[in-house]
Curated annotation (Swiss-Prot):
Protein name per Swiss-Prot or TrEMBL: Probable acyl-CoA dehydrogenase YdiO
Entry superkingdom: Bacteria
UniProt record similarity statement: Belongs to the acyl-CoA dehydrogenase family.
Swiss-Prot/TrEMBL catalytic activity: a 2,3-saturated acyl-CoA + A = a 2,3-dehydroacyl-CoA + AH2
Native source organism of the sequence: Escherichia coli (strain K12)
Database matches in SUPFAM superfamilies: Acyl-CoA dehydrogenase C-terminal domain-like, Acyl-CoA dehydrogenase NM domain-like
Taxonomic path: Bacteria, Pseudomonadati, Pseudomonadota, Gammaproteobacteria, Enterobacterales
Enzyme class: oxidoreductase
Length: 383
């Protein structure tokens, strides 16, 4: 088994490091975080340099790359301390290529190329329907050749920043109850839409919002994918999202580890660097083991994606392990850095707030255990 990177991958990671460290120092991200400002300059730079468009076909303004390369790049972005949770450009385009119309794909690609930002927010969750999307009550109805969407969504990431939303809505009278949900392409500026940002522990650089839809009018052509297939399309989206979650968690953990190791060499206590103490050495050694495990897990699942293998179990386990373990590593980094680690002057405190979301978004830890555990039992039922 060859663990070495290709020359192209080495050059890509070096270019990411140079771009971020040269143009976007920690002070930039700290200011955006403290002010709740979306870092448009950063996103524009990623798009202009092709980083946020990796894996997207050239015809849509992207750079072809396999999933292993994409995950290496994503880990490198967060390893540099940058908010990798903003990068869903390629994911948006991939979803539209899989089940969107030609016009929806065109809008997605053009919007992303023009702004550098993802084109749409995914509006799934509702006050009474989080992990259980089947309980969603937002409806779509037809009248006089138009379609009207009514309901409330919550915890919608990027609803304030992105120009469009993909809204999961229920047919109140479906012919087949198993095919009640359909995705709709909705312009966020349409009449009847009200967006209220929520205040959060972390992810301050990107809004998370309540979205109210009151008789929002859309066209039949705004249907995304086949009618009644919305839930299945969402499930496809989740598997790749979970791998992405795992990759960016891993990068943040690695950045926190490196900050803690440098601090342990520099901080003098009782006449010597604190890194000379065996308790600090033990923490760093265990952190290094965890990071190695996380990286290997992410790259294995990415390889499986490149081989067109099912990611149902492996992506769920990767997200579960990496999100939990990243929190452990970052928490240990804060402990090593002491009081400084608990202040906004140290970026590990931002990582601690931001990575905590990874244990919730894209499927909670508990749902990941359920998804993986159920599939494992099924796989061994007749063995």
């Amino acid at each position: 088994m060859d663990f070495s990177l290709t020359e192209e991958q080495e050059l890509l990671l070096a270019s990411i490091r140079e771009l971020i460290t040269t143009n976007f120092p920690e002070e930039y991200f700290r200011t955006c975080d403290q002010n709740g400002t979306y870092p448009r300059e950063f996103m524009r730079a990623l798009a202009d340099n092709g980083i946020s468009m990796l894996g997207v076909p050239e015809e849509f303004g992207g750079i072809p790359a396999d999933y292993v390369t994409q995950m290496l790049a994503l880990m490198e972005v967060s390893k540099c301390g940058a908010p990798a949770f903003l990068i869903t450009n390629g994911q948006c385009i991939h979803s539209m290529r899989r089940f969107g119309s030609a016009e929806q794909l065109r809008k997605t690609a053009e919007s992303t190329l023009e702004t550098g930002d993802p084109a749409y927010a995914l509006a799934l969750t509702e006050p009474g329907a989080g992990s259980d999307n089947n309980s969603a009550t937002t409806t779509y109805t037809r009248k006089n050749g138009k379609v009207y969407i009514n309901g409330q969504k919550t915890f919608i990431t990027g609803a304030k920043e992105y120009p469009y939303m993909l809204v999961l809505a229920r047919d109140p009278q479906p012919k087949d109850p198993k095919k009640a949900f359909t995705l709709w392409w909705v312009d966020s500026s349409k009449p009847g839409i009200k967006i209220n940002p929520l205040h959060k522990i972390g992810w301050h650089m990107l809004s998370t919002c309540e979205v109210y839809l009151d008789n929002v009018e859309v066209e039949e052509s705004d249907m995304v994918g086949e009618e009644g297939m919305g839930f299945l399309n969402v499930m496809y989206n989740f598997e790749m999202e979970r791998l992405i979650n795992a990759a960016r968690s891993t990068g943040f953990a690695e950045c926190a580890f490196e900050d803690a190791a440098r601090y342990a060499n520099q901080r003098i206590a009782f006449g010597k660097p604190i890194g000379h103490n065996q308790m600090i050495q033990e923490k760093l050694a265990l952190m290094a083991i965890k990071i190695d495990n996380m990286r290997n897990m992410v790259l294995k699942v990415a390889w499986q994606a490149d081989q067109h293998q099912s990611l149902r179990t492996s992506a769920a386990l990767a997200k579960l392990y990496c999100a939990r373990t990243a929190m452990e590593v970052i928490d240990d980094a804060i402990q090593i850095m002491g009081g400084l680690g608990y202040t906004d002057e140290a970026r590990v405190s931002r990582f601690w707030r931001d990575v905590r979301c990874e244990r919730i978004g894209g499927g909670t830890d508990e749902i990941m255990i359920y998804v993986a555990g159920r599939q494992i039992l099924k796989d061994y039922q007749n063995k």
